[in-house]
Amino acid sequence: MNDIDTITNAWGRWKTAQYGTTCWFTESTQYGRNKDTRSYMQHQTNVSAPKDLVYSNFVQQDGGSTLLGQYDMINEGSQVIELAVNLQQGLVDTFTWSVTEQLKVGVEVKVKANIPLVGGAEITSTVELSLSSTQGASTSKSSNYGASTKVLISPHSHGWGEVALSFTELRTQWVGNVGLQGYVAIWFNNKVALNNDGDYHYLWFIPVEQVFWECVQHNIVNTSGYVVQGNGVLAQATGTFHSSVGLNLKTIAHERPYPETSEAVRTFYNYASLVPDLETRVRSAE
């Protein structure tokens, strides 16, 4: 991403050449640093930080597991026993935001990034992330995982097993959309009448969206990372989000006749999501 000064200065050289003159300066988001634009702060290009980041769909990878509990029961009766295994465990989830393309709009922009709703417990933390550097941010959150799973013990059987919490490594891309609205100041080294009405001036103020539109239309300078809109421009910081969270319960159940016989042990596996509507919730965070 080119910084905004590089873009407006390239445009300024092109624009003034259309009128047979040269450009002294352009200003966009920092009118206060130039004595010739300090009196026109009302025209400055304003920078609006996003309320949150926009996340893409998540890619999941196995992140290992931890043992939550075990059970061991003998059913001497003639009816199936439904055993409820109640589990609760306090664990630490980690969340990391990396910035791969920072903003270069002349001023620092920060966002209060919410943790996407993808964990196995309610998560309400936010982290302050600068979109103007590649430093990134990370946070840890203690989560109290509680779950109940049901195990069936057949009649005249000995059942035992374990329940584990499977962790999932989640990765996704994010975008921070920063709004630019206002005007780019440009100083022509000879007076010109941009309005073609005989009104000649050195200093003119051009809507920032027109500046970027002309850069794209006339291939003046690379504007990747900026999106022209009807009433302004979006400057887009991008990066990746990574978290390690508990999402699934894995039950390994063993069963053999009771009293014991030579019959082989039967083993069953069962998986239960702690967030059954994970896909819907992830998409809603977009």
From Swiss-Prot:
It is found in: Secreted. It comes from Pseudomonas aeruginosa. InterPro entries: Aerolysin-like. The keyword Secreted applies. It comes from the Bacteria. Its main location: secreted. Cytotoxin is thought to form hydrophilic pores in cell membranes. GO terms for cellular component: extracellular region. GO terms for molecular function: toxin activity. This is Cytotoxin. Residues 267-286 form a propeptide. Belongs to the aerolysin family. Keywords: Secreted, Toxin, Virulence. It holds the Pfam family ETX_MTX2. This protein toxin may be one of the virulence factors because it shows strong cytotoxic effects on most eukaryotic cells, especially leukocytes.
